[in-house]
Amino acid sequence: MTSTFHTVGAAAAMVVLGIAWTVYVSVLADERGMLRAAAPEEGFLPLVQLSLAVLGVLTITSEHATGMIRTSLVVVPRRSTLFLAKTGIVALATFATATSILLLTYVTSRLIAGERQLGFNESAFTDDLPALLASGLSVTALALVGLGLGAAMRSTAGALVSVVSLLFVLPGAVNYLPAPWNTRIATLLLPNLIPQIASERMSSRLGDGFLPPWAALAVLFAYPLVTLTIGYYALKRKDA
């Protein structure tokens, strides 16, 4: 329970950081007249992704560490039912939490920005909504990936290292590949699926991705599907 408060609290820190960032760039804009700054809901998204991915990992690894998994299996003997229930709870909780945090960050930053030209506040909410929903889905996908890896590895440290590698290490390493392989591989990496779902450029360096929105969404769903399948069979075959 304590870890849940900590992880959700860390994710919610995005709102505070978003307010601080918007105030900072607003002051700069008042001095310079105009400024193009990164949107806080995009810049601080990795904080939410990592925090709630930790929650997904701990949902299963904490029970293995404390032995509570045996109690859970006594209450719910069917491992498929137990794992499906955990998957559903993590999915609903993380999507609701992430979407709420993203929307609150979005609204507060635009209210603070006012009429200032900061770059990120020049588009309408309806234009930004696909990216916000895609960001929320990415958080849920990472949390479910964490759950699947945690079930497969039964190690908090191992699962977290894998999540961090997927979220930060691999995207960073791909940037150093020669073109066009950097863009081709980056197109399939989880963090780069968000702009493709929203029909946006991945980055100025990588350019446009190769996936249409529906295909990017399918790849995003494939990440948790694969890891959850592996985690389920690991839970089913190994002794608690």
What feature does the model see in each segment?
Residues V219-A240:
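Junction motif at the cytosolic side of a transmembrane helix
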Residues H6-T7, A11-V57, F83-A152, V169-V174, ...:
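Secretory targeting signals
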Residues M34, G56-V75, R79-S80, T87:
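Transmembrane helix boundary and interhelical loop/hinge segments in multi-pass membrane proteins
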